Amino acid sequence: MGLNRLMLAKKTTASGGSTADNTFTVTIGQQGYQYGFSRYNATIGEVEGNVQHEGKAVTLVMLCYYSGYLDFAFTIEGVSSGKRNVTVKLTLVDNGTSGTIEFPKIDYQSYVPGFYEYTRNLTSDVIRMFSKANVGKKIKVEIIFN
């Protein structure tokens, strides 16, 4: 099948205008001690843009850090079962701080509904991205479908 990459990022005005097709802009939000973006059991942060994978719309549901855990969830239009192997690369747009997170087996969870997994296996750079100091800042998220 090959390597499929989705860029979830902001295209700046200097490089051609508003948010480009197949990209997201994620703005870090906060609710209590929870930081990131979520539309599952909370409304935190913002995301905009249009992303497709294999011709189907992808929706970011959650990229949220709380108490040592990073929750990650997304949906693929028309898909309601199965599992994926994805790598998520995060880059804080302000200063270029980045980190990579592996989700080798992210299963579809009907209660979300969507592909959902959490991890505690995070670098200190990733942990620092999700902090009070970065609320309102932009984060670039690259999802690599392996």
Set out the residue ranges of the language-model regions.
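Short, surface-exposed ligand- or partner-binding patches at beta-edge/loop junctions that are enriched
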Residues: G136-E142
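Aromatic sugar-binding surface patches on proteins
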Residues: V112-D125
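Solvent-exposed serine/threonine-rich low-complexity stretches and specific carbohydrate-binding patches
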Residues: G99-P113
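Short, exposed beta-strand-loop hairpins at the edges of beta-sheets
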Residues: V126-N134
